[in-house]
Amino acid sequence: MFVPNHLHLLVKGYITNPPKSETVLNQWFKELVNKVGMVVVAGPTSVYVNELGNEGITGTVTLATSHASIHVWDAIHPSMFQFDLYSCSEFTPDQVLNHINEHFNLQSATWQFIDRNDMEFKLIDSGKWVAEH
């Protein structure tokens, strides 16, 4: 019997080149999905919120029995972001962190990688990512 993965990556961090448009963020999602071998069923969809004190962009993509989302607050520097990816496909935190870094210049991040296959969540790995200077 096939038992799919239930992997969930949660990341909080800071970037110095935040996405400034919905088009840029949607393209980033398309490239990420391709890198980790998932199938898009809806989206990506992104929207910029221009609410004082909460300025930033939010994007989501619905994947086959999975999802990815990111929220970037760009009024501060470096910009803070929160990201999560839930997938039944195999992927690694490094794949995602490198993709964030390539596009948005990741400065620092903390992350947790969780196995949600059983009723009890299991922490697979966690760590910190710091830019090399």
Per-segment meaning from a language model:
Residues 1-133:
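Polybasic/polar functional segments that serve as interface/processing modules
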